[in-house]
């Protein structure tokens, strides 16, 4: 059935009113059928003020609307009543997750939530100072600048003072020779092992 835009609007209004009567006014099936008959009876050749909102449908269209309401709303009226009136149990579907974290320790490793921080930043700004570090700082402050001055002077001294260039060269030559001799010995041992393995394979091939 082809309807115009205004007819579609009125038809949707009729459907909404039918559901509203069931949901709000708690009309029974007999009362809803009676109400629909009264509304459809207003569709006719008379053009009174009361029926001017519904007289846009002819008799054929009105019969099509009634047939549709029979197979949709009225046929499943009990189902609509159950949907509007019956209280339904709310089923909440959820899940529980148990997360076990590592217990904090006094070691050098940060807690699990702080593993993304570099160790330098963690040890400087987050990790509390240990008892040993606190005692060392306190002893350094008690000793004063007089005792720390010779250490500073000693650390500033050149470790090569008292050695000539020839002494340094001789030491470097000796260290280099020792390293090269060790490498050469290791290479010779590996070559000897490979040679023995090849000889053993050749002997097996000869016997075969």
Curated annotation (Swiss-Prot):
One of its GO terms (cellular component) is cytoplasm. GO terms for molecular function: calcium ion binding. InterPro entries: CLAMP (IPR032727). Residues 139-159 are annotated as: Disordered. Residues 143-156 have a biased composition (Acidic residues). The gene is CABCOCO1. Its main location: cytoplasm. Calcium-binding protein. May be involved in the control of sperm flagellar movement. It comes from Homo sapiens. It comes from the Eukaryota. It is found in: Cytoplasm; Cytoplasm, Cytoskeleton, Microtubule organizing center, Centrosome; Cell projection, Cilium, Flagellum. Keywords: Calcium, Cell projection, Cilium, Cytoplasm, Cytoskeleton, Flagellum, Metal-binding. This is Ciliary-associated calcium-binding coiled-coil protein 1.
């Amino acid at each position: 059935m082809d309807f115009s835009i205004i007819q579609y609007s009125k038809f949707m209004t009729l459907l909404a009113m039918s559901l509203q009567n069931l949901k709000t006014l708690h009309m029974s099936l007999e009362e809803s059928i009676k109400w629909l008959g009264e509304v459809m009876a207003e569709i006719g050749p008379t053009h009174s003020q009361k029926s001017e909102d519904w007289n846009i449908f002819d008799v054929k269209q009105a019969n099509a609307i009634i047939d549709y309401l029979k197979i949709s709303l009225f046929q499943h009226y009990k189902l609509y009543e159950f949907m509007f009136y019956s209280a339904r149990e709310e089923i909440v579907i959820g899940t529980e997750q148990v997360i076990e974290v590592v217990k904090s320790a006094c070691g050098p490793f940060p807690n699990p939530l702080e593993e993304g921080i570099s160790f330098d930043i963690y040890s400087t700004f987050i990790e509390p100072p240990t008892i040993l570090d606190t005692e060392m700082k306190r002893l350094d402050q008690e000793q004063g600048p007089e005792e720390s001055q010779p250490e500073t002077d000693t650390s500033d001294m050149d470790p090569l003072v008292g050695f000539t260039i020839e002494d340094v060269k001789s030491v470097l030559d000796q260290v280099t020779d020792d390293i090269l001799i060790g490498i050469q010995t290791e290479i010779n041992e590996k070559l000897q092992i490979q040679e023995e393995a090849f000889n053993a394979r050749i002997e097996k091939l000869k016997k075969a």
